[in-house]
Amino acid sequence: MPGVVFDLDGTLVHSAPDIHAAVNKALAEEGGAPFTLAEITGFIGNGVPVLIQRVLAARGEAPDAHRQAELQGRFMAHYEADPATLTSVYPGAEAAIRHLRAEGWRIGLCTNKPVGASRQILSLFGLLELFDAIIGGDSLPQRKPDPAPLRATAAALNEEVVLYVGDSEVDAATAEAAGLRFALFTEGYRHAPVHELPHHGLFSHHDELQDLLRRLLA
């Protein structure tokens, strides 16, 4: 059977609340004002370095490599210490992946989240064993929307990957750059209207994924 690759944040798990909590914990240590969940959710998608850049820019701070590294380090310390208390798996996601595996599909994960934190979250939810390959935001020099991470995930699966499943503009651009079909989960962290994202199929609940795959492969 061929392979399918998933994004993580906003596609398989609703992780924004824990990311939000870790950012605010890091800022509270220096007396900084907290961000709202909506604000932090809007910063998610391009990996931790860009998340922190956006936090600093929103605070009106000029770009500074030392400041970036310092806040990023404290954010990661908080996030890795408590990555999943407020996180949830989207309804039907685990069942959909287990069904695909039962049919013989190879399953990959391509995310801009650091690979260690990704594995930690998957393990906490009992999902780690379901993935044959995992590429994170620190696995390669490039991050999505560069196609290199998605291509590396496909190569690690050692199967023809027919679909990338994600929720955002970054994911859509990554699939397009890699020359793969893209299935858009509409309930994640995208900013633009659905019609503005290039996609070959879309779904709002993971229960719909098997039928979508059948239609795309017909």
Curated annotation (Swiss-Prot):
Gene3D superfamilies documented for this protein: HAD superfamily/HAD-like (3.40.50.1000), Putative phosphatase, domain 2 (1.10.150.240)
Positions with a binding annotation for Mg(2+): 7, 9, 167
A GO molecular-function annotation: metal ion binding
A Pfam entry, by short name: Hydrolase
Pathway(s) where this gene product acts: Organic acid metabolism; glycolate biosynthesis; glycolate from 2-phosphoglycolate: step 1/1
GO BP terms in the entry: DNA repair; glycolate biosynthetic process; reductive pentose-phosphate cycle
Cofactor(s) needed for function: Mg(2+)
Record-level GO cellular component terms: cytosol
Keyword Membrane: no
Known catalytic reactions: 2-phosphoglycolate + H2O = glycolate + phosphate
Enzyme class: hydrolase
CDD domains cross-referenced by the UniProt entry: HAD_PGPase (cd07512)
This protein's UniProt keywords: Calvin cycle, Carbohydrate metabolism, Hydrolase, Magnesium, Metal-binding, Photosynthesis
Catalytic residues (positions): 7
Paired cysteines (S-S): none
Keyword Manganese (UniProt): no
EC number(s) reported in the record: 3.1.3.18
Family to which this protein belongs: Belongs to the HAD-like hydrolase superfamily. CbbY/CbbZ/Gph/YieH family.
PANTHER family the UniProt entry points to: PHOSPHOGLYCOLATE PHOSPHATASE
Protein task: Specifically catalyzes the dephosphorylation of 2-phosphoglycolate. Is involved in the dissimilation of the intracellular 2-phosphoglycolate formed during the DNA repair of 3'-phosphoglycolate ends, a major class of DNA lesions induced by oxidative stress.
UniProt-recorded name of the protein: Phosphoglycolate phosphatase
